[in-house]
Each structure stands twice: as C-alpha cells, then as structure tokens.
Amino acid sequence: MKSSVEQLSPTRVRIKVEVPFAELEPDFQRAYKELAKQVRLPGFRPGRAPVKLLEARFGREAMLDQIVNDAVPSRYGQALAESEIQPLGRPDIEVTQKEYGQDLAFTAEVDVRPEIALPDLTGLSVSVDAIEATDDEVNAELESLRARFGTLTGVERPVATGDFISIDLSAAVDGEDVPNAAAEGLSHEVRSGRLIAGLDDAVVGLSVDESRVFTAKLAAGDHAGRDAEVTVTVKSVKERELPEPDDEFAQLASEFDTIDELRASLREQVLQAKRVGQAEQIRNATIDALLERVDVPTPESYVQAQYEGVLHSALSGINNDEARFNELLVEQGSSRDAFDAEARTASEKDVKRQLLLDALADDLKVQVGQEDLTERLVLTSRQYGIEPQQLFVYLQENNQLPSMFADVRRELAVKAVAQAATVTDTDGNTIDTSEFFGKPPENDVTDLLDDDADGDAGVDADGDTENSAEPADADSADTAQGAG
C-alpha cells in the first residue's frame, strides 16, 4: 500500500491511498467463502459453490463494493499510522478507482492538529481579583446556620415574605383542567422562587383557606409553554423562629465555645470558598495570557462540533424543542442569532484552548498518572451523584475514557505553567500558587520548553505513548479510524 499526504491548510490534509489489487485478493477469497456458506445452489453442497457461479448469481460489482467498503477503513487507519497524522473528527472519503483486477485508490480529507509555535513563557505574569471575607458575607453564613437550627411555628395571620406555607395547586388552559398539573399539600418558602413564577406574589396576603388565581406558563406536559390559569389555596402558615446568635448557639451548632470563634471559622470558610474561585481565575487567566501570545489555527469542523455540543446541551432540557428554545431566549431579552454568535465564539475559543494545551503538554512531556485519573473520576462522579466505578463503566462503554485522559493532561499542563508564572492580585499582592497547584518541578517549565527532545506525544500511566487529539466531548468530534 502507498500513501501520500497533501497539506490543504494548517488544519486540514488530503491523504491519497493506493492499495494493490493483490492485497485485496485474500479479502475476495474470504468473502466468497462466507457467501458460499450462506447460499444454496442446486447441485452443490453448502460452501462448495464455484466462484464463477456466485459471481453470476450476485454480481462481481456487488462483491467488489463490499470488499472496498470493508477495506477502506483499515487502510485509512494504516495511512494515519504511517504518516503520524493526528486527526480531529471524521474524514471525508472519496473512492477514485475501484475496478476488479485494478488497484484500489481513494482520498481522505480530514482536519488535523495544527503545528503551533509555542510562546516564550519567560516572565509570564497574570493578575486576578483580590479576595476578602466581608462582614456581610460572614453574617449571611451565620444567618444560614441559624436557619438550619430554627423552628417552625404556626401563625394565624396572612402570608408574609419568609413564611413557610402548605398549598394546593391546580391549573386550567382555555377553561379545561390540565391533567397531572394539580397537587395538594405542597410545602413552599415564600419568596424562595423555587416553584412557579408568580406564585410568591399570589400568596402574599392570603389567609388559610383563601385562594387566588394567577397566570403562569406551564413548563412540561402536553401544554408546555402555554399560559395557564393557576389556582393556589393556602392550607397553613408557619414562621421560622431563629436562635439568638450567642455563645449558647455557637456551642449548639458547632465545636466552638463562643460566637466570636464561630464567626472566625465562618470567615475562614468564606475565604476558602473564594480561594477555590481564585484558583479557577488563575487557570483561566493563565490560558488567556498564553492565547494572547500565540496564533492557534482552528479547524472549522472541530469548532462546529463543539458548537453543536453546546446547542445540544441547551436543548436537552426542553425536549429538543427549538421553537420553545427561541421563545425562551426572547423572553430573556436575547435572540437565537445572539445565542448562536456567542456559542460559536465560545466554541472557537474552547477549541483554541484545547489545541494549545495539547501542544503545551507535548512540549512539557506531561505524564498522566493513575492518581490523576482517579482524582478526576472521583470529582466528576460527585458532580453526578454516582459512584466512581459507575462513572468509569459508563465512560468505558461510551468510549469517553480517552477524552477524560486528554482533559486531565491539559489540566496538568495549565497547572505546570501556573506554577511557574508570577501571579498578583488587584491589590498588588503576590499570590503563592503552590497553595492551589503544589510546588513546581525541579526543572523550570521554561527549561523544559527549550529542551530539544521530541515532545510530540504524551505519556500515559503505563508509559505508553498516547495521542492527545481527542476533544473534550468524545461524542461531538471523535478521532476517526473508519471511513464512517
């Protein structure tokens, strides 16, 4: 087999492949043998029918088509391996020669990872927001803690903001009751905004057993998106009594003896939460600083796949109803055109980020260890509320483990650069990034980038070379090894 590669653009190539007919003859023999087992021809035992009779019965062209369809994917994969191309997405394949007894020829156009000239990281510096825990934030945490230890007491007065009420609900569209839209004994905190839009305004001022009708859009069912007349009836009213914020409360609600000690602990909790946000800001600022220093060509099909993933996520919550999605955008003061423009811009930036970090990980010789993958599995499984083993099985069955590997590898690349960067906050304070990302390696990142050693491949946990071209979403743009 012969193959050659033509560079069409920084992000796309055309691979030309020629397969000698002699290489396909064994495929023909196997195909005829299998076909002979499946058909019965008069005068011949199963599996004994001559090739010429099979060709006369089924046609040589049909057999040739089948052989070519089976041969192209494997030969395409072989051409990729020989040329060391890292494809992004599925190829566009065209068979240019297909005749019995002649060489098979086809071309495959596919997007590829572009060559990226990495920026000079010497003196890289980023700035992030300063953080502090304000008294208001500490008080809010204290109020939340007091609410957890509060008691509900029934009151004989109209509903007010902050009350806890029990209500009955029913809905009608065009005067007809809506099935499955009625509920009794629902608990609701007034002004929490957790149920139907307009409900809080409707119940304020009502007494027990009083009702009010208001208009709201139904979110689900056959009448989803339509205006309905909703009737709410108040069945009970309770108010929450909070414990006094004193030393006694501190001893009840925590391991501390005094309210001052409890406040100090809450202040540290607020700061810790903000440090998590600051770490994320450092990551993003580091990536943005890198992107400002380098030009990253973007494969259009890769950007399109990323955009389609964003759109799919947005539509999945409303049963893929694009008309309703467009209505919701208008209700929010936006439009479909604005959404598409923002989503495409974000998708293009995300693709640039992925490609840059893949190239950076190559040059830094990033190694993804078992602990790194396990940590990501645990964190992701917590987000979905499932066991890590369940998530692992799902990713394995859906061929998404390579995608997770690539994401972890990119994260380690960002971490390495952030460790070496100078990070300050808006107040001029230098931030010790080791608190977020650990200590930098003995070899400086900038030294590693100057290393002349080959850095075209990452290393996986077993020490094998690993192609890192997989996108963040394996379903949206997977690395193709077939003619698909």
Swiss-Prot record:
Pfam families found in the cross-reference section: Trigger_C, Trigger_N
Catalytic reaction(s) noted: [protein]-peptidylproline (omega=180) = [protein]-peptidylproline (omega=0)
GO MF annotation: an example: protein folding chaperone
Keywords linked to the UniProt accession: Cell cycle, Cell division, Chaperone, Cytoplasm, Isomerase, Rotamase
EC number per UniProt: 5.2.1.8
Keyword Cell cycle among UniProt keywords: yes
Gene3D superfamilies in UniProt: 3.10.50.40, Trigger factor ribosome-binding domain, Trigger factor, C-terminal domain
Compartments, record wording: Cytoplasm
Main location: cytoplasm
PPIase FKBP-type domain segment(s): 162-243
Alphabetical list of InterPro entries matching this protein: PPIase_dom_sf, Trig_fac, Trigger_fac_C, Trigger_fac_C_sf, Trigger_fac_ribosome-bd_bac, Trigger_fac_ribosome-bd_sf, Trigger_fact/SurA_dom_sf
GO BP annotation list: 'de novo' cotranslational protein folding; cell division; chaperone-mediated protein folding; protein transport; protein unfolding
PANTHER family to which the protein is assigned, alphabetical: TRIGGER FACTOR CHAPERONE AND PEPTIDYL-PROLYL CIS/TRANS ISOMERASE, TRIGGER FACTOR-LIKE PROTEIN TIG, CHLOROPLASTIC
Recorded family membership: Belongs to the FKBP-type PPIase family. Tig subfamily.
Domain statement: Consists of 3 domains; the N-terminus binds the ribosome, the middle domain has PPIase activity, while the C-terminus has intrinsic chaperone activity on its own.
Protein name: Trigger factor
